Amino acid sequence: MNPEKFTHKTNETIATAHELAVNAGHAQFTPLHLAGALISDPTGIFPQAISSAGGENAAQSAERVINQALKKLPSQSPPPDDIPASSSLIKVIRRAQAAQKSRGDTHLAVDQLIMGLLEDSQIRDLLNEVGVATARVKSEVEKLRGKEGKKVESASGDTNFQALKTYGRDLVEQAGKLDPVIGRDEEIRRVVRILSRRTKNNPVLIGEPGVGKTAVVEGLAQRIVKGDVPNSLTDVRLISLDMGALVAGAKYRGEFEERLKSVLKEVEDAEGKVILFIDEIHLVLGAGKTEGSMDAANLFKPMLARGQLRCIGATTLEEYRKYVEKDAAFERRFQQVYVAEPSVPDTISILRGLKEKYEGHHGVRIQDRALINAAQLSARYITGRHLPDKAIDLVDEACANVRVQLDSQPEEIDNLERKRMQLEIELHALEREKDKASKARLIEVRKELDDLRDKLQPLTMKYRKEKERIDEIRRLKQKREELMFSLQEAERRYDLARAADLRYGAIQEVESAIAQLEGTSSEENVMLTENVGPEHIAEVVSRWTGIPVTRLGQNEKERLIGLADRLHKRVVGQNQAVNAVSEAILRSRAGLGRPQQPTGSFLFLGPTGVGKTELAKALAEQLFDDENLLVRIDMSEYMEQHSVSRLIGAPPGYVGHEEGGQLTEAVRRRPYCVILFDEVEKAHVAVFNTLLQVLDDGRLTDGQGRTVDFRNSVIIMTSNLGAEHLLAGLTGKVTMEVARDCVMREVRKHFRPELLNRLDEIVVFDPLSHDQLRKVARLQMKDVAVRLAERGVALAVTDAALDYILAESYDPVYGARPIRRWMEKKVVTELSKMVVREEIDENSTVYIDAGAGDLVYRVESGGLVDASTGKKSDVLIHIANGPKRSDAAQAVKKMRIEEIEDDDNEEMIED
């Protein structure tokens, strides 16, 4: 025996068989070991040939019988160092070598080894024992070589028998298991026309990811099964080639090319009865390319041009441009078929066609309104992906959510079960106690437990009954799907008796059983819901995008209606601005906003420190419960023309192209946001040109060519233009109307008309009056009080102290900001000194009053928490009447617990 004259597969088989003999401690290496090694490989030729000859379970039976025979062989312990081959094994190999020479093979292939093995009397008897005739196994093995009898001319030659079966799957065979294809008739007809050509009969499907390119080929497979194709395509096999399987495990140089050649040879031998489908056809270009070898595309080209190979390719537009168009010789052999994204109505039709498949898989019922919602919401809110893929994913995930809820216990039962467990633990603990109180409690617990069990039992029974009904419906739907597949198979084989039995017998029985079970659920079903409705789809959209599209709950309705009032708690005055913003949010959440524009776009004008930026922060806090979720762009950083690229990302060829823009990336990740362009007048005019498209159509294309959706964002721009006119109006030099007109004149002079014309509203913020500034001072003092509250310290402040702070810090030109600066410098600094000097203890109160030319600070024990009642006071205690220093301590004591309201009924912040 010369191993060099054996194929790699033969050598591997003999080595495995030898290892089997060594591990078992057998004295000889026999044909039985060889049979054991061959049958243990599930993808090998031997088990496949036995299954074809004797039925589906024949290979498993043969493996069992061979293993039993191996166990009966005598074994030695320890095993011998060298195990000789038995005379019967040598005869097997000699017979195989004789057959090899007669066939003209250069290497001994596995199929010849099997043919030699089948001549062995012991193996023949074992196969007869399981009812498999060796003659039939031989004929199945011979079929592997094909009609012309392929020759094995290399060490890897026998790996390519049945190459199409090994490296592909027949879509026509699996047509019944594929999802139904709705629409796409024009594309399928175009593919059929190209396939019917004499030469260059190779269509390539190109389109965006997720538009249904592979579905077109699956639709063709289903038409071939039904016979709805021209004569040239009847009875053809549509094989989907797995390029990964072709490349995987090709260890030796030339092995990949040999595999591919064998696939192409099988296609050629089929004489037009095989059409190859290569998904992601760009992978063919460069596949298997190493130094000194050619890639797969060059092996395809000659056959593609001559029309010997009919091939359907599929790839995305980007990859087609990137890979296929570069190889003009490869590209010209394919005819392009563009697969466009379906419209929303077409997507709804596709979803209706798939509805039954998803209902059967998940065991739920999908409402038609949910399908319409999925198509509409995905088209509107999920950008960067394409229909119908994103709509199908929405339906699938919504069904999965409902299914998960069905498989878990209802909340009502779960709560009662937990309570029952707690009472049982308490019962066991009390049973050991001897005192009267425990015995009395024991009687109570037993009674509670009995009541709970009485309540729980009917609920559990109802839940189990409903669960069983839903599970049975799911099982029947899956059975119906399997029967429909069997029906298609029977019709394809023209087994009319079987088809009639299925259509008018089994399938009708299953459908009537499903209808009966679904009919019983018409009563009010409080325990479990198996329906997937529009609200489930909306919930998934909200989870994916962060955009609240779910139906408005009662709490949220109240929040939206009271949005303006809550914004006023943080922003003093500025009614026009607050109302404009809150109304825009209300329109958006009610679903009546303009669909193709941002939720709202505003230009806030006014002097510094009047609350323009504060309103944007307050809005972000109300919408997202966190003011930091504001997308803030400081326009003072965009004073040069080239800085526009920082907003939308650098163009190709520039450093930072891969990073994306500061604005576009932030909005792409969180489409539902508040965008603040602060100090907008300081930016270069080129920046405004970029924003025109955002304000008009709610979209912007970034540096990488991706379209970013701004339709769910609120855009706020702030500017100080014309602030001096408003200050003149405040001091009485001119009327406020004249001042506003002057401001608008300045704005029109600075900004282009096309920008101003696209804004929803231009809001002029009025300078803050003295009373409004006092409210601001109180809000700032609350901020200090919140910081102190972390130490358990309450803060009390008199009106006199607030008036003193205002008198010291008020500057009409700078608005409210000087108040914060003065407070930080004076009040916070003094409090910090008192903390460091340990004058302020935990759970004490600091009260601030106006003294002679300065603020006076007093500390008293008893702070946020009252020791006697355990109640918390407000973090900021406001002393409205402004008691003098001598009376202040008593006033603080009285007001520590109760809530104090100012003259404007403004609520204090609670800890």
Curated annotation (Swiss-Prot):
<feature type="binding site">
    <location>
        <begin position="207"/>
        <end position="214"/>
    </location>
    <ligand>
        <name>ATP</name>
    </ligand>
</feature>
<dbReference type="Pfam" id="PF02861">
    <property type="entry name" value="Clp_N"/>
</dbReference>
<dbReference type="InterPro" id="IPR003959">
    <property type="entry name" value="ATPase_AAA_core"/>
</dbReference>
<dbReference type="Pfam" id="PF07724">
    <property type="entry name" value="AAA_2"/>
</dbReference>
<dbReference type="Pfam" id="PF00004">
    <property type="entry name" value="AAA"/>
</dbReference>
<protein>
    <recommendedName>
        <fullName>Chaperone protein ClpB1</fullName>
    </recommendedName>
</protein>
<feature type="binding site">
    <location>
        <begin position="606"/>
        <end position="613"/>
    </location>
    <ligand>
        <name>ATP</name>
    </ligand>
</feature>
<feature type="region of interest" description="Repeat 1">
    <location>
        <begin position="6"/>
        <end position="73"/>
    </location>
</feature>
<dbReference type="GO" id="GO:0016887">
    <property type="term" value="F:ATP hydrolysis activity"/>
</dbReference>
<dbReference type="GO" id="GO:0071456">
    <property type="term" value="P:cellular response to hypoxia"/>
</dbReference>
<dbReference type="GO" id="GO:0005829">
    <property type="term" value="C:cytosol"/>
</dbReference>
<keyword id="KW-0539">Nucleus</keyword>
<keyword id="KW-0067">ATP-binding</keyword>
<dbReference type="InterPro" id="IPR041546">
    <property type="entry name" value="ClpA/ClpB_AAA_lid"/>
</dbReference>
<dbReference type="GO" id="GO:0009941">
    <property type="term" value="C:chloroplast envelope"/>
</dbReference>
<keyword id="KW-0547">Nucleotide-binding</keyword>
<dbReference type="GO" id="GO:0009570">
    <property type="term" value="C:chloroplast stroma"/>
</dbReference>
<dbReference type="GO" id="GO:0045727">
    <property type="term" value="P:positive regulation of translation"/>
</dbReference>
<dbReference type="InterPro" id="IPR003593">
    <property type="entry name" value="AAA+_ATPase"/>
</dbReference>
<dbReference type="InterPro" id="IPR028299">
    <property type="entry name" value="ClpA/B_CS2"/>
</dbReference>
<dbReference type="InterPro" id="IPR050130">
    <property type="entry name" value="ClpA_ClpB"/>
</dbReference>
<keyword id="KW-0175">Coiled coil</keyword>
<dbReference type="InterPro" id="IPR036628">
    <property type="entry name" value="Clp_N_dom_sf"/>
</dbReference>
<dbReference type="InterPro" id="IPR027417">
    <property type="entry name" value="P-loop_NTPase"/>
</dbReference>
<feature type="domain" description="Clp R">
    <location>
        <begin position="3"/>
        <end position="147"/>
    </location>
</feature>
<feature type="region of interest" description="II">
    <location>
        <begin position="532"/>
        <end position="723"/>
    </location>
</feature>
<dbReference type="InterPro" id="IPR019489">
    <property type="entry name" value="Clp_ATPase_C"/>
</dbReference>
<dbReference type="GO" id="GO:0005634">
    <property type="term" value="C:nucleus"/>
</dbReference>
<keyword id="KW-0143">Chaperone</keyword>
<dbReference type="GO" id="GO:0005524">
    <property type="term" value="F:ATP binding"/>
</dbReference>
<keyword id="KW-0346">Stress response</keyword>
<feature type="region of interest" description="Repeat 2">
    <location>
        <begin position="85"/>
        <end position="147"/>
    </location>
</feature>
<dbReference type="GO" id="GO:0043335">
    <property type="term" value="P:protein unfolding"/>
</dbReference>
<dbReference type="InterPro" id="IPR004176">
    <property type="entry name" value="Clp_R_dom"/>
</dbReference>
<comment type="function">
    <text>Molecular chaperone that plays an important role in thermotolerance. Together with HSA32, required for long-term acquired thermotolerance (LAT) in plants and naturally high basal thermotolerance observed in germinating seedlings.</text>
</comment>
<feature type="coiled-coil region">
    <location>
        <begin position="403"/>
        <end position="500"/>
    </location>
</feature>
<dbReference type="InterPro" id="IPR001270">
    <property type="entry name" value="ClpA/B"/>
</dbReference>
<dbReference type="Pfam" id="PF10431">
    <property type="entry name" value="ClpB_D2-small"/>
</dbReference>
<keyword id="KW-0963">Cytoplasm</keyword>
<feature type="region of interest" description="I">
    <location>
        <begin position="164"/>
        <end position="410"/>
    </location>
</feature>
<dbReference type="Pfam" id="PF17871">
    <property type="entry name" value="AAA_lid_9"/>
</dbReference>
<dbReference type="GO" id="GO:0009408">
    <property type="term" value="P:response to heat"/>
</dbReference>
